[in-house]
Amino acid sequence: MERMSAPHALTLLLTACVAFSTQAQTTNVRLDVWDGKGYQPCEPSIAMHPNNPDVVVAGSILDNVYRSEDGGQSWMKDKLTSPLGVFGDPCVVASPTGDFYFLHLSDPEGMGWRSEALLDRIVCQRSTNGGKSWSKGGGMGHTPPKDQDKEWAVVNHDGSRIHACWTQFDAYGSEEPGDSTTILCSFANAKGKKWSAPVRVSDKAGDCIDSDDTAEGAVPAVGVNGEIVVAWALGPWIYFDKSVDGGQTWGEDRIVADIAGGWDQTIPGIGRVNGMPVTCVDTSNGPHRGRIYINWTDTRNGDTDVWLTHSDDGGETWSTTRRVNTDGADRDQFFTWMTVDPVRGDVHVVFYDRRHNDTREDRSTHVVVASSTDGGDSWTNRTVSETPFTPEGKLFFGDYNNITAVDGHVRPIWTREELGVLSVWTALLDLP
């Protein structure tokens, strides 16, 4: 096990970068950096103990797991193992009881892309001690030769059940018109070992190419009455559905927003960028309790921007789409993720930001956390990266970042590139 400490806190000067967003007094902490062996770390995920913000657990590609006992100031790194294999798409979520779950893709033969069994199921592993140790894991969606991909999960309010949703590919990457993708969901008790038979959620199927016309981006959330809600992207639309019986059955899909240009977006220095939706619910006792939020990126204004819509009636009707980034036109913001503070009800969105550049082609990239205390009506954009980075566009950079927040303790997590080497970082953002 490897321990990495926070770098010395830097005093952030009010320089020209303040002109494009509020400069948060944050310290950046590195969780990991590629050591030259195996896969480079990316696609980070992070979760905070709901009753003890000092305990934070994170993960990254391919099988990295990190834990902190001081609110993210220092981290211990380990490798996650499972008899079912560990092959990326890390999803770390916390239970109201303080358990943590790490969901990921499977590699039961340990041969990676050389194995026909790769991606044959979604795997869930549980930790009851803050990420120090993990269960062997339980699988869901095992229907070979179909491939299971792009999963995310949420735990219900009393911690008794975990729900997961993902995309099933008839054959990943296939261009055959008869091959399709669907959104599936399953659930298990708190142990996360035995999962229910998957239920199809998406009424309309997508193709298997893994692009705009593929059904992807299912991030479930739990409503205040225990309903399960989820949105995903397919073609130029964001679809929404919900279950009111604990995930056993689902309703008719609703189109709730357009995702102009599709979810498969292109950014200089990165290549393909995922603009898929993220779904959250305000479960606090604040004025917007029960509000469902959906967050995504698209190119409706020509450049890539971060967007949000919300519903106060269980998904029946949706608000006018609002832009989260507060800059002018013709600069890109991308790789968005959202969380809602379960204590305060504040909405926090993390994304990469290039508003400080002279031209849209410039690749210098900052990290911004946008926060709303009024239900998404207005936004404060804070630059949380101490310095920008400039990606070269030659590496697999991953498909997402992540963010967690409890009672004003906000921890974004992101990937950074320096001279062809990837590293994973967080920022210690503690709001009054």
What are these regions (language model features)?
Residues 2, 17-19, 65:
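Intrinsic disorder/low-complexity segments
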Residues 25-432:
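Extracellular, repeat-based ectodomains that mediate carbohydrate processing or recognition
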Residues 5, 20-22, 40:
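Intrinsic low-complexity/disordered segments
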Residues 8-21:
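Bacterial N-terminal signal peptides
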Residues 1-7:
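N-terminal secretory signal peptides that target proteins for export/translocation
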